Amino acid sequence: MTGVPSSTWFSAAPHWEWLIALYFFLGGLAGGSYFLSALIDLFGSREHRPLAHLGYYVAFPCLALSGLLLAVDLGRPLRAWHMFIQSNTYRPMFKYWSPMSIGSWALAILGFFAFLSFLAALAEDGRIRWSGLRRLRAPSPAGRIIAVLGGFFGFYVAGYTGVLLAVTNRPIWSDTPLLGLLFIVSAASTSSALMILLAYRSGRTTPVVADLHRMDDWVIALELLVLIAVMVSLGPVLSAWLNVWGILLAIVIVLGMIAPLVLSWRARRFHQVTLATPALLVLVGGFLLRVVIVFSAQSV
C-alpha cells in the first residue's frame, strides 16, 4: 500500500449515480423540515404555527419522492417491498445490524408521521374540511405525540445518509467519523433555507421568518466548521479532492456558505427587505455538497 493514503483505495465503488445524490438531498430536506416544524409546534408560539405548516408541506412530498428515487435506483422498483417484508414468510424484515435496513424503516415511519402532519396542516389552512384532522397537531395530546416521535425520526433521517456512507468502505466516506454530523447540520441549513423561500413566496414574511434567518446563519457557520473538521480528519485522504471535485467543493464553500452569510449580514445591516438570495444559494450549495461527497469517493 505504499503511496496510498488509505486501504479504502482498494475497495470497489457502489456505482451510485445522480438518483442517489438527489435522494440524499431530498431525504435531508424531508427530515430537517419535519424536525424543525416539530420543534416549532412543541416549543413555538401561536404566531410560529404558519411557518411550521411550510415544513410539513415540504416533508411529506420530499419523503415520497426520495422513496421513489431509492426504489428506482434499485433497478427493480416493484420489488422494493422486499426491504420491509420477507418474500417467503411475508413477515416484517428488520436487520438491526444494517444501516440500509434501519434507514429504510426510518424513512417509512417518518413518512407515516409526515403524512399525518401534512393532513393536519392542510386542515388548519382550510384546504381540507375535516376539523378532526387539526387534532393531529400540537398542542393537542395526539399532536404532541406525533411531533415528538416524528421529530425524532426526522432528526435520524436527516443524518442517516451520512452514517450510511461512513460504513461503506470507500475513500472519504469511511475515513472520517463526521459525515453523519455534517449531513445533519447541512439538512438543518437547507431545510431552513427552503422554508424561508416558501415563506416569501406565500407572503408569510413575519418576524418569525427573520428569526429563522438568524438561526440559519448560525447553522451555516456551524456547517462550515464541521466541513473544515471533516477535511482535517481525512488527513492524507484529503488528496482525493485535489481535482475537479475539490474545485466544486471550494465553490460550495464560497457560494453555498460564505456568500449567504455575507449577503444575510448586508441585508440586515442595510435593512433590505428580502433575504431570498442567500436562502437559494444555501439550497444549491447543499445539493452540490452531496454531489461532491457521493461522486468524489467513487472516482478514486
Locations of the language-model features?
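N-terminal signal-anchor module of multipass membrane proteins
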Residues: 1-42, 291, 295-299
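Alpha-helical transmembrane segments of multi-pass membrane proteins
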Residues: 66-69, 260, 285-286
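Inter-helical loop and helix-membrane interface segments of multi-pass membrane transporters/permeases
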Residues: 5-13, 83-93, 130-136
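Membrane helical hairpin/interfacial module
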Residues: 29-85, 89-106
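Long, contiguous internal "core" modules enriched in hydrophobic/ aromatic residues
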Residues: 17, 24-26, 43-46, 98, ...
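Final/C-terminal transmembrane alpha-helix of multipass membrane proteins
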Residues: 277-296
